Amino acid sequence: MAEEVSNKQVILKNYVTGYPKESDMEIKNVTIKLKVPEGSNDVVVKNLYLSCDPYMRSRMRKIEGSYVESFAPGSPITGYGVAKVLESGDPKFQKGDLVWGMTGWEEYSIITPTQTLFKIHDKDVPLSYYTGILGMPGMTAYAGFHEVCSPKKGETVFVSAASGAVGQLVGQFAKMLGCYVVGSAGSKEKVDLLKSKFGFDEAFNYKEEQDLSAALKRYFPDGIDIYFENVGGKMLDAVLVNMKLYGRIAVCGMISQYNLEQTEGVHNLFCLITKRIRMEGFLVFDYYHLYPKYLEMVIPQIKAGKVVYVEDVAHGLESAPTALVGLFSGRNIGKQVVMVSRE
C-alpha cells in the first residue's frame, strides 16, 4: 500500500489582470499517494527549492498560441524547481536522485519526465543554484549572450534588469570576455551590487533618470554594441537610438510590459534599418542541447570564485506567493528562490 501524505500546494485562484497580488493565490492542503501510477514512466518527487521567474506572470492570464500554457485556476502553479526522487517509473531516474526541471508549487509532485527534467550530478555547489545559475536562468544568460549576440572582446554591452537572475550573469560573462559592461537596476542597493559584487564597469538607477536616452549616452558616448533586453518599453526605445551600427539586441524578456492591460508601443524601430541592427527574440528551450557545455564552463568558474551569484531565498511554501509577487515591484535582491524543504 502506497504511503499517503499531506501535500501543501500553492493554488492560482483565478486569472489575473494588472499586477498580481498575494490574494490571487491560496495555500491548500490535500493528500497525495507517493506512488508512480501503474504502467507510467512518471517520477514522484519531494520538492526542495522553487524558482520565481518573471515569465510566470504571463501564465497567470488566459493565453493562446504562446510558448507556455496558462496556469489552470484552481490547480497548483508550476515552475522550475529542484527536487529529490522518491520513486521512478523512468529508468533514467532512480530513487534518491536529485533533479531540476518543471515541477509543481507543492511539497510533493508527480512529474512526467518528458517535460524538461535534468539529473543533478555536481552537488559541491548549493542545490538552490539549479534554480538559477546552474538552471534555466543560467542557460538563458549563456545562450542569449554567447549564441544570440555573438560577442567579441572589447565590445560595449548594456544589460537591463541587470541584478536579476539572468542579468547578473550576462554582465559577468561579458566581463570574462573583455567587454565594457553597464547595467541598469531599480534601487541604489542593486546598483551598488552590480559594481561591487558583479564587476560591472558602471551601473545606474533607471528610476532616477528623467531622460533614459541621455543616461545611456553618458555611459556609451560611442554607442552600444550589444543590448541584453529584459525590460522593453521606454528602455528599449532609448537603447535603439544609442545602438552602434551593426549592433545586436537579444530579446530575453520585457518585464515592464507584463502587468499592463495595454502594452506600450516602441517608437524608434526605424533605427533597426538605419543602424543595421539585428534584434532577435529567443527561448532557452532551443538551447538546452548546450547545457553540458555550459556546465563545463561555469562550474569551475563558480568553484574558483570567478563567477558569483546572489540569491534572495524565501523560506517555506507559504512564503511563495509573496516572493513571486515581489518580482514585479523589484522587491527581490538577486535571484528569487523559495526553499520548500532542506531534504
UniProtKB/Swiss-Prot annotation:
Residue sites binding NADP(+) per the record: 165-166, 186, 190, 206, 230, 252, 258, 282-284, 332
Catalytic activity, reaction form: an n-alkanal + NADP(+) = an alk-2-enal + NADPH + H(+)
Activity across pH: Optimum pH is 5.4 with 1-nitrocyclohexene as substrate.
Uppermost EC category: oxidoreductase
Keywords linked to the UniProt accession: NADP, Oxidoreductase
Binding sites annotated in the UniProt record for substrate: 55, 80
EC number of this enzyme: 1.3.1.102
Residues forming coiled coils: none
Transmembrane segments: none
Record's keyword annotation contains Kinase: no
Single GO molecular function: 2-alkenal reductase [NAD(P)+] activity
InterPro entries according to UniProt: ADH-like_C, ADH_N_2, GroES-like_sf, MDR_fam, NAD(P)-bd_dom_sf, PKS_ER
Keyword NADP listed: yes
A Pfam short name: ADH_N_2
Further remarks about this protein from its record: There are no hydrogen bonds between the substrate tested and the crystallized protein. The reduction of pulegone shows no sterospecificity and only the pro-4R hydrogen of NADPH is incorporated into the C=C double bond of pulegone.
Function as written in the Swiss-Prot or TrEMBL entry: Reduces the C=C double bonds of alpha, beta unsaturated enones, but has no activity on enones with an endocyclic C=C double-bond. Shows a high specificity for NADPH as the hybrid donor. Substrates are 1-nitrocyclohexene, 2-methylpentenal, trans-cinnamaldehyde, methyl-trans-2-methylcinnamaldehyde, trans-2-nonenal and 1-octen-3-one.
Family stated for the protein in its record: Belongs to the NADP-dependent oxidoreductase L4BD family.
Binding partners and assembly: Homodimer.
Protein name (database record): 2-alkenal reductase (NADP(+)-dependent)
Native source species: Nicotiana tabacum
